[in-house]
């Protein structure tokens, strides 16, 4: 299939993590699946996925813990012959306040273990990212406590706003809008 893309959301497995900030990538993928009226239909030991042939995209969530996400991303790229520059990784970003969505074409992991794993397994920093802000004024300064905390009822409106922005950006990406154009619109 010509120019297939991969959109993968990062998160942790298990009901105990489902509503945590660290699972923002999974939340975005779930919302994207809902937009296209599909579910992740296939699974292996590394992840769950669906190939949307009409849109030339694979939507996916790893079945690994965050720190091992790169194993699935590497497998998916090899399985569908997807180049790293056609990969979009969606993940939580503690450096940005909740409600913020930023796109990036390459760069370091900035202490995000899921991104560190993707970089290590793809052997490159040259892949696209959608960074979903999760920082809250009410959260601890201890990294683990912050990312494993749940969104509060007071944060629900900001969460919904950010999910809407993320879906708009990913829909553009899937529809073939260039990353530079998407960054111009969504990073403004």
UniProtKB/Swiss-Prot annotation:
Site location (Discriminates between blocked and unblocked aminoacyl-tRNA): 12
InterPro entries named in the record: Pept_tRNA_hydro, Pept_tRNA_hydro_CS, Pept_tRNA_hydro_sf
Catalysis performed (reactions): an N-acyl-L-alpha-aminoacyl-tRNA + H2O = an N-acyl-L-amino acid + a tRNA + H(+)
Pfam families: Pept_tRNA_hydro
CDD domains: PTH
Residues the record marks as active site: 22 (proton acceptor)
Location within or outside the cell: Cytoplasm
Classification via Gene3D superfamilies: Peptidyl-tRNA hydrolase
Binding residues for tRNA: 17, 65, 67, 113
EC number(s) per entry: 3.1.1.29
Positions bearing the site annotation: Stabilizes the basic form of H active site to accept a proton: 92
GO molecular function: peptidyl-tRNA hydrolase activity; tRNA binding
Main subcellular location: cytoplasm
Function as written in the Swiss-Prot or TrEMBL entry: Hydrolyzes ribosome-free peptidyl-tRNAs (with 1 or more amino acids incorporated), which drop off the ribosome during protein synthesis, or as a result of ribosome stalling. Catalyzes the release of premature peptidyl moieties from peptidyl-tRNA molecules trapped in stalled 50S ribosomal subunits, and thus maintains levels of free tRNAs and 50S ribosomes.
Family membership: Belongs to the PTH family.
Name of the protein described by the UniProt record: Peptidyl-tRNA hydrolase
Origin species: Mycoplasma pneumoniae (strain ATCC 29342 / M129 / Subtype 1)
């Amino acid at each position: 299939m010509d120019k297939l893309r991969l959109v993968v959301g990062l998160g942790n497995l298990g009901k105990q993590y489902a509503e945590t900030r660290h699972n923002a990538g999974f939340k975005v993928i779930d919302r994207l699946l809902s937009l296209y009226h599909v579910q992740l239909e296939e699974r292996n030991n590394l992840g769950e996925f669906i190939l949307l042939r009409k849109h030339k995209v694979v939507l996916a969530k790893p079945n690994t813990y965050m720190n091992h996400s790169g194993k699935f991303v590497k497998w998916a790229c090899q399985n569908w012959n997807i180049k790293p520059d056609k990969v979009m990784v969606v993940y939580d970003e503690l450096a940005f306040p909740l409600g913020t969505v930023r796109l990036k074409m390459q760069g370091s992991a900035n202490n995000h273990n899921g991104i560190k794993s993707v970089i290590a397994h793809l052997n490159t920093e040259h892949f696209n990212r959608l960074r979903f802000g999760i920082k809250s004024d009410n959260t601890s300064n201890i990294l683990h406590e912050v990312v494993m905390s749940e969104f509060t009822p007071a944060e629900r409106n900001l969460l919904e706003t950010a999910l809407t922005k993320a879906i708009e950006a990913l829909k553009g990406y899937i529809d073939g809008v260039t990353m530079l154009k998407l960054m111009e619109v969504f990073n403004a």
